[in-house]
Amino acid sequence: MTKYILPLILLFCSIGFLAANIIAETKINKVTGEIGILKATAEPALVYGQHKETRQYVTLEVENKGEPQSVYIQIDGIPYEQIALNSGINQIETSVPETTERKNVSLSIASGSSILAEQAVKSYPVKQWTVYMVQHSHTDVGFTKSQTEVLTDHIRYIDYVVEYCERTENEPEELKFKWLCEATWPVIEYINNRPKEQVERFIKYIKNGQIEITGMFFNMSEMIDENSLKTFLEPIRQLRALDIPVKTAMQNDVNGIAWCLADYMPDLGIHYFSMGQNDHRALRPFECPTVFKWESPSGKSSYFYRFDHYRTGNRWGISDKNATEMAPSVFAYLNNLTEKGYPFDAVSIQYSGYHFNNSPPSLVPNAVIREWNEKFASPKLRSALFHEFMDYVVERYDAQLPVIRAAYPDWWTDGFGSAARETAVSRTTHADMIATQGLLSIASAKGKPLPQGIHEKIRHIHTNLIFYDEHTFGAAGSISDPRGESSQTQWEQKSSYAWEAFKNAQVMQETAGGLIQTNMPRGGVPTVTFYNTLNWERSGVVELFINNEIIPRNRDFKLVDAIGNKLTTQLLRSNREGSHYIAYAENIPPMGYKTYRVITGEEEATPLPQLSIINNIIENDYYKIAIDTNNGSIKSLFDKDLDVEMIDSESPWLLGAFVYETLNNNRRQLEQYRLTEYTRESLVNVQVRPGHDGALYKSFFIEGDCNGVEKRSGVKIEVRLFNNEKRIELIYTTRKLPHLEPDGIYVAFPFKLDDAKLFFDVQGGTVSSGENQIEGSASDWNTVQNFVSVRNDNSQFILGSREIPLFQLGGIRTGQFQRQKTFNHPHVYSWVMNNYWTTNFRAYQEGEFSWSYYLTSTDNTSNATATRFGWASRVPLHGRVMPAGKANDYPVDYSAFSVDGENLLMTSCTPSKDSGYLLLNVRETDGKKTAFTVKDQGGKLHEFQIVNAIEEPLSDVTTSDLFAPFENKFIKLKL
């Protein structure tokens, strides 16, 4: 004990001597006026004192108007340390004793016998923080450089990462170089394109805990559909084969995420989500970074961390400052967390090696972390992997984490409206691939061997769709320099993904049809076979092109089934090669087909009569429509079955109105979270002309002029009222002028329905606008997969578009940025085009573009009804025409299998990678526990197994299962 007493005595004596000298002179000269403490701040940090005790870190801003001098800092009148003051403003670091309660501490500056300046500082208990610093490179497929450069850079970065891991593997855990691979895309390319020994080094440091692989291909918008998400997750299969663990799904920059991933990821063993959100033109959910339990519609749970920006650490200065220079930013951040009630003693921060996207890794931040931890006892910085932070939080705070069962809609998909044509191509191809993979599944069920390499071709198409749907749309200078080389070349590359997918999907659809046609019934007359690739029996309109060789032009014909029942048909248009018809195909079996004979008459076809429009009113058995000829819209839509008027006549824009908007050349206002400078206008010089009064539908045309589009073509709107089903279609065509100034196009659907709510479908489920969506997620506009529903207890109106994904619900809401969405009227606006961004997305679009809407109304208010109408409209029946041939006795109809339950939706069916199996993705839509079985056409039960998205088994083989409410499952079906 004696060895400690003597040093303490000497210490107290020296302090007492120093204090006595200063205090003795206090009365002579307390303040000179040349030195002043401008600011004294007790920071949320601890440092080590002169005897390794922990003390609260304090920063002082001291002004010295005189000459440089040496002074002492006193704490509550007791001298603590000597410092040098330069002339001018001095930034001083000192400390006060750590405290367990809030209190004022007196800080003074003394020189010799004088107290030169004095100020109280508020000391408080310091929270012991650990900051998990996660280094990564944000993967933009373009933006900062061309798409062709990005992948090679990221592959090379992994080489650097391996070197840095090796260099630091013997450091303490918190100082080892650690790296998070944000996307699986470059990881898989690295594995496939590096020598075996280099890949083995890479895997070594994954297993050494220095590299973390995440589970998402890259940062994805909500444009992607559930079918393509299987390909999006496919790299996990290859990672599994190499025994590479994947615990995390990471989404950076994007302000939302597909809800179905909350179902898919836990079954893949991925229980952590992270989102480094970018609040440019977007709200950020939650007051501060938040860990919560994110539930899928069925209640499947994962842990979700909403980061701040994905380069917050760079904003602090981790990549270009020292510890002292970085400290104010760190302390301000932690103080802000405390003020907002952040509940944990640890926080995770993302950063890159350098302060830009697609950054290479760097060891510099590790040196800063070392310097920081040598200086500060708290907060401690750790070089970390993301899952380490989540492991820490879940282990200590699991019971208090909030539970959120809600969708997370994305704010940034509005930019896809800057390329309406290519976005429409992407959406059309997604829908076509659902049908095509269904056709391949039917072929497999019939025992047809699939073409060699078919799975790789499917993957290639979906990969191209993924690259188009991915969040990086173009160059950083796409708006400021739209005609520059970078903007032009990046857009050419981006758009090529959509067109490449579309082209190959068309070929694959023909391949699939060709596989099945060898088992089609044939005979002495031509045939038409209608295919249904969804899981319920369907009837609907199918467009057919039939050569003049099969049906001579203007010749009467009929399509009849095996017992002579005739389908309703209608001519659309003809050319020198043949004619386009539509037919109403009836009762086509689920996952199957039905064949009709083409019987050609000797008489000429009766010309279609022209529709009679009286007093601008058109009606059929279901609806009565009144046209507003002033601005080319529908002012009344009366449902005869429901006995309701569907349109709000008080709306400034009536149903179908073409609304052209300009922002007075001020696109920056949306970055200020407002839209106050704008003009909106509709059609002028409107003309209404009749179309045909056909057997399948009646039609009329509205034509008019409008700013923003080519004058000689104007805007053409065709409205079709169908006779065989309760359905209206609106088809728009215009030629957009290439304006660089911000402008946009909406189409109005101002519905009227008392006490109505607004619903829309996303990947994985149905969202009630403003209700089961995370507060602060996209509320001005939403990305719709297949339908919008206006619904009360008695009725629902169902609307959708095959081409256009963006809808605004509750009115034109651009610029409102409502954190908790509310609306007064169930008005719906389709947002067709815009160029409102200041970067990344397109500055203009031009040329002819056609798009369409489908609409119905019903007294059935279920999700299942809306879902089936929307899906059947986006994924229509397909028809295949064959000439007369050698007669055979193949059956005229066929169903590979059926799934009972109108509330069970099969979102996709594709041949499994294992021969003799199909992979189905099925979800329950109405919130009901539902028994699940699969039967063949004869009623025999199929065996199946519950698997995950990459076909790993989750259950034993069975013939029945139970779906929980809203549950989503992958089914591996044995043929």
Which sequence ranges carry the predicted segments?
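Bacterial Sec-dependent N-terminal signal peptides
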Residues: M1-A24
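Active-site and substrate-binding clefts of carbohydrate-active enzymes
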Residues: Y132, S137-D140, P289-Q517, T533, ...
